[in-house]
């Protein structure tokens, strides 16, 4: 297993009126982050919050290329990012959802206290696959065929690449002590965006290089 210290290359916020970042995603232009009663769009080039939607946003956030998906309580909402209208709602299995991401037609949801990641049918919420973790799951993302998730244990957080079939940990990036992660997303290239929990911040972390191959977003989970 590869181990390294996480390299934080950017930090945004805190933002006025936002006490906690609960989930995070990226639409190719804006970083969207959940803050309880709003979904906020952040321009990572300027660090400015440019838009907000009034929706319940208490946990993970995802983007499928057109729509946003937002965990809230025991459900997942599908949201029009332009109007903020909730289009459909599906059940979130078992409650206690944390991270959320989209990869090639399915949703992937982290369960915090159950230490699990579920692959879900986005139409019904049915569980298609479950991966076990040995730490609390606080975020999940796919990039270039790699499944990554964020963890928390005490004051320690890390980002870890895992085998999507077995859950075996293949690589870890250790965050500084006391720096938590609440939501994880890739920009499809050389960085991850991480929610900063009660700090109210969003952080960018450098993604490890894979030879000369450039990233291009979420890839098919084999």
Residue ranges, per PLM feature:
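Conserved beta-strand positions in repeat-built beta-propeller and related beta-rich domains
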Residues: 31-37, 68-74, 109-114, 149-154, ...
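Beta-strand-rich domains and repeat architectures in extracellular enzymes and scaffolds
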Residues: 12-37, 59-60
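Residue-level detector of Asp-centered blade-edge/turn motifs that repeat once per structural unit
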Residues: 26-28, 63-65, 102-104, 142-144, ...
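Short loop/turn segments that connect beta-strands within beta-propeller blades
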Residues: 43-47, 80-84, 121-125, 163-167, ...
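A short helix->beta-strand "capping" segment at the edge of beta-propeller domains
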Residues: 1-17
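Blade-level signature of beta-propeller repeat domains, shared across WD40, Kelch, NHL, RCC1
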Residues: 181-222
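Surface loop/turn motifs at the tips and blade-to-blade linkers of beta-strand repeat domains
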Residues: 12-17, 51-56, 89-94, 130-134, ...
């Amino acid at each position: 297993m590869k181990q390294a210290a996480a390299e934080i290359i950017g930090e945004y916020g805190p933002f006025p009126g936002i006490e906690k970042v609960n989930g995070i995603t990226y639409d190719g232009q804006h970083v969207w982050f959940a803050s309880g009663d709003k979904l906020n769009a952040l321009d990572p080039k300027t660090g400015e919050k440019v838009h907000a939607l009034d929706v319940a946003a208490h946990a993970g956030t995802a983007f499928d290329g057109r729509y946003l998906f937002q965990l809230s309580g025991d459900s997942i909402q599908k949201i029009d990012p332009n109007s903020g209208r909730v289009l459909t709602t599906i059940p979130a299995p078992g409650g206690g959802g944390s991270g959320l991401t989209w990869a090639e037609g399915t949703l992937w949801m982290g369960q915090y206290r159950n230490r699990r990641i579920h692959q879900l049918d986005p139409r019904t919420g049915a569980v298609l696959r479950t991966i076990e973790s040995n730490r609390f799951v606080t975020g999940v993302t796919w990039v270039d065929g790699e499944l990554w998730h964020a963890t928390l244990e005490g004051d320690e957080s890390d980002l870890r690449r895992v085998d999507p079939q077995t859950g075996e940990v293949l690589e870890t990036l250790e965050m500084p002590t006391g720096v938590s992660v609440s939501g994880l997303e890739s920009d499809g290239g050389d960085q991850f965006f991480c929610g900063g929990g009660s700090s109210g911040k969003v952080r960018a972390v450098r993604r490890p290089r894979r030879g000369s191959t450039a990233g291009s977003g979420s890839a098919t989970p084999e």
